Curated annotation (Swiss-Prot):
It comes from the Bacteria. It comes from Clostridium botulinum (strain Okra / Type B1). Belongs to the universal ribosomal protein uL6 family. This is Large ribosomal subunit protein uL6. The lineage of its organism: Bacteria, Bacillati, Bacillota, Clostridia, Eubacteriales. Part of the 50S ribosomal subunit. GO terms for molecular function: rRNA binding; structural constituent of ribosome. HAMAP family: Ribosomal_uL6_B (MF_01365_B). Signal peptide: none annotated.
Amino acid sequence: MSRVGKLPVAIPNGVTVTVTPDNVVTVKGPKGELVKAMSNKINIAVEDNSVVVTRDNDHKDVRALHGLTRALINNMVTGVNEGYVKTLELVGVGYRAQLQGKKLVLSLGFSHPVEMEAVSGVEFEVEGGTKVKVKGIDKELVGAVAADIRKWRKPEPYKGKGIKYENEVIRRKEGKTGKK
């Protein structure tokens, strides 16, 4: 039995979970609604304030899907109830972020500003010009948008300049030593 998959997903107050016969899970909550199609190899049932995920057989691929399905449903329930936030920090001289409507404009040392449109389901928040918060109810989408922002200037190991996640530790390197 999957250690993750055998745990039921608790449904908090204000959140409703519905499962169609073809395993399409719909989760509605105070922050919005998420719909996701799950594998038909897994059984999903809503039983008194919890979602129970079970499997029919012990094939390797079904065992893998068991824990995955439970984790995805848990992420959906948490997302519509609390939401997800990824915080990025811009480290470097002249590296700035600002909002223009729903568009995020980054100055990252290029000859042009980098503009990113907010994807539906994700919103940006800028604090002090050097911190960008990516907020949304879909964990996968929030992480993907944050990774797209970080991709423009990954932190470099010598001075630590670039865009990094808030709690990310940059492994630093020693520079070259001069000739004597």
